[in-house]
Swiss-Prot record:
<dbReference type="InterPro" id="IPR034288">
    <property type="entry name" value="CuRO_1_LCC"/>
</dbReference>
<dbReference type="Pfam" id="PF07731">
    <property type="entry name" value="Cu-oxidase_2"/>
</dbReference>
<dbReference type="Pfam" id="PF07732">
    <property type="entry name" value="Cu-oxidase_3"/>
</dbReference>
<dbReference type="InterPro" id="IPR034289">
    <property type="entry name" value="CuRO_3_LCC"/>
</dbReference>
<feature type="binding site">
    <location>
        <position position="480"/>
    </location>
    <ligand>
        <name>Cu cation 3</name>
    </ligand>
</feature>
<feature type="domain" description="Plastocyanin-like 2">
    <location>
        <begin position="161"/>
        <end position="314"/>
    </location>
</feature>
<feature type="glycosylation site" description="N-linked (GlcNAc...) asparagine">
    <location>
        <position position="242"/>
    </location>
</feature>
<keyword id="KW-0186">Copper</keyword>
<feature type="binding site">
    <location>
        <position position="130"/>
    </location>
    <ligand>
        <name>Cu cation 2</name>
    </ligand>
</feature>
<comment type="function">
    <text>Lignin degradation and detoxification of lignin-derived products.</text>
</comment>
<feature type="glycosylation site" description="N-linked (GlcNAc...) asparagine">
    <location>
        <position position="342"/>
    </location>
</feature>
<keyword id="KW-0560">Oxidoreductase</keyword>
<dbReference type="InterPro" id="IPR017761">
    <property type="entry name" value="Laccase"/>
</dbReference>
<keyword id="KW-0439">Lignin degradation</keyword>
<dbReference type="InterPro" id="IPR002355">
    <property type="entry name" value="Cu_oxidase_Cu_BS"/>
</dbReference>
<feature type="glycosylation site" description="N-linked (GlcNAc...) asparagine">
    <location>
        <position position="441"/>
    </location>
</feature>
<keyword id="KW-0479">Metal-binding</keyword>
């Protein structure tokens, strides 16, 4: 059943791509209906009710071309508040459609609906959509395939076939109950029971062999795998036995191609990779494996998800009943930070005439953010399960973000920020310390709903520094509303005197989600040309739940095409 469903998905993808190819060069409006509903799903011999879109897990793939206008009507038939984020879509002048609850919109209440309207401007590649409230994105997510305009090819040889590969994370228990319990006790949440590949855990888990994704390939053909990490809390190593992968795109942005045996992909990130099948039938199958990368000192899901790469047999009748061998790749160690660093160092923008790297050469505003864990004190006479009887927290510049009761963007647009948010997010740590050395004795963080205000058109440089508080850890930071250039990164404390001289301002990789290295720092630059309120947060869901998030408020520009339009009439109310 599961193998058949994987074949059906590939057929649907091919059919959709053929339909898009047959359409003219002019941009069109593409309309989708998302029915958010509860669905019974069985994995690991355990059946539970999950929230899905259109009864599918993972959800449906959205197809569009660069320049198209997209309208997605979301009808909420689930018992939970809901909102959908179109991860990586720039949302130029359409911030009302970005999706994070209480940032750009109030959530869609049960029984309600909302139409997300946006235009895909200057983007092509693999992105994805997901719920952006609580932990509902565990099952409410799906791919977005954005093709170049009709008649425009890829800057690499066209593949024989394109296949979305979506990594996820599965709990036998209700994920809303998992995070609710963690927030009540102040401790860490229960870890997941499995990872998934296109919704299937694969044969390495008990009672799961029937739920295995299988990719059928023809000898000598090249396939483009559209990789998406939709896992909640884990970065993943990925490899296919006895095959190499050529990376051609990350976060829907072309890169200079390079070939690897293993890649790293963090939650929120996407990557297009080319897989060239062996020239002749090998008489074997090959595992596609993914397992976590982590430097955390706490518990985590140390399991491996497997799919199977199978070759079409040119002589299936003579091979009937014959069991072919299956090979497994060797993945890096769980905590192999060097493997991660070596991979990320290879990423460079294509920086060609057709796809230039518009790196801001001059900077108007510089910021320095610490990102990491911390604590809140336990309530008087309370019992908490965090470090030393405290409650786990997380922060940026020691501010643990608290979601407001109404949406920031609505409050800003109406000029009613009082009592909703403050515009004094710190530009740098108020109490500097040796960030990657011995942590301070006081690990408490402050709560706040603070934004950082930017003038329209500002060129921004931001250095994000990991801290050793409660252990050095990699943090995948996602910025809504913008792509950014990763101009530098390193280990230890950022050196503001010497490190900027090493920045790559020629062809740095451009992304929307970047890993702040464990025990290190990363520097990014972006051009603030999109008015609105834009969320920035760790894409490890547990860290975001603990407060590792903030918001940028980009003011309107002077021209009409630099001003955020009024909200749509059907925007949900709190």
């Amino acid at each position: 059943m599961a193998a058949a469903s994987s074949v059906l998905r590939c057929c649907l993808l091919v059919a959709a791509l053929m339909t898009l190819s047959a359409m003219g060069a002019e941009a069109i409006t593409r309309q989708y209906l998302f029915d958010v509903q509860t669905t019974s799903v069985t994995r690991l011999c355990s059946t539970k009710s999950i929230v899905t879109v259109n009864g599918q897990y993972p959800g449906p793939t959205l197809f569009a071309r660069e320049g198209d206008h997209v309208e997605v009507t979301v009808v909420n038939h689930s018992p939970y508040n809901m909102s959908i984020h179109w991860h990586g879509i720039r949302q130029l002048l359409s911030g009302w459609a970005d999706g994070p609850s209480y940032i750009t919109q109030c959530p869609i209440q049960p029984g309600g609906s909302y139409v997300y309207r946006f235009t895909i401007t200057g983007q092509r590649g693999t992105l994805w959509w997901h719920a952006h409230i609580s932990w509902l994105r565990a099952t409410v997510h799906g791919p977005m395939v954005i093709l170049p305009p009709a008649g425009v090819g890829y800057p690499f040889p066209a593949p024989h076939e394109e296949v979305p590969i979506m990594f996820g994370e599965w709990w036998n228990n209700d994920t809303e109950a998992v995070i609710s319990q963690a927030l009540q006790t102040g401790g860490g949440p229960n870890i997941s029971d499995a990872y998934t590949l296109n919704g299937l855990p694969g044969p390495l888990y008990n009672c799961s062999a029937q739920d295995t994704f299988k990719l059928k390939v023809k000898p000598g053909k090249t396939y483009m795998l559209r990789l998406i990490n939709a896992a909640l809390n884990d970065e993943l190593f990925f490899s296919i036995a006895n095959h190499t992968l050529t990376v051609v795109d990350v976060d829907a942005l072309y890169v200079k191609p390079f070939t690897v045996d293993t890649l790293i992909i963090a939650p929120g990130q996407t990557s297009n990779v080319l897989l060239t099948a062996k020239p002749t039938y090998p008489g074997a199958s090959y595992y596609m494996l993914a397992r976590p990368y982590t430097t955390t000192q706490g518990t985590f899901d140390n399991t491996t998800v497997a799919g199977v790469l199978e070759y079409d047999d040119p002589c299936p009748t003579t091979a009937a009943g014959k069991i072919v061998p299956i090979f497994s790749p060797t993945l890096p160690q769980i905590n192999d930070t060097n493997a991660v660093s070596n991979f990320t160092a290879k990423l460079r923008s294509l920086a060609s005439a057709g796809y230039p790297a518009a790196v801001p050469q001059q900077v108007d505003h510089r910021f320095f953010f610490t990102v990491g864990l911390g604590t809140h004190p336990c309530a008087v006479n309370g019992t908490c399960q965090g470090p030393n009887g405290s409650r786990f927290a997380a922060s940026i510049n020691n501010v643990s973000f608290v979601l407001p009761a109404t949406a920031l963007l609505q409050s800003h647009f109406a000029g009613k920020s009082k009592g909703v948010y403050a515009s004094n997010f710190p530009y740098y740590p108020l109490n500097p310390f040796n960030y990657t050395g011995t942590p301070p004795n006081n690990t408490n963080v402050m709560n706040g709903t603070k934004v950082l205000v930017l003038p329209y058109g500002a060129n921004v440089e931001l250095v994000m520094q990991d801290t050793s508080i409660l252990g050095a850890e990699s943090h995948p930071l996602h910025l809504h509303g913008f792509n950014f250039f990763v101009v530098g990164q390193g280990f230890g404390n950022f050196d503001p005197i010497n490190d900027p001289a090493k920045f790559n301002l020629y062809d740095p990789v451009e992304r929307n989600t970047v890993g702040v290295p464990a025990g290190g720092w990363v520097a990014i630059r972006f051009h603030a040309d999109n008015p609105g309120v834009w969320f920035m947060h760790c894409h490890l869901e547990v860290h975001m739940s603990w407060g590792l998030k903030m918001a940028w408020l980009v003011l309107d520009g002077s021209r009409p095409d630099q001003k955020l339009p009024p909200p749509p009439l059907d925007l949900p109310k709190c």
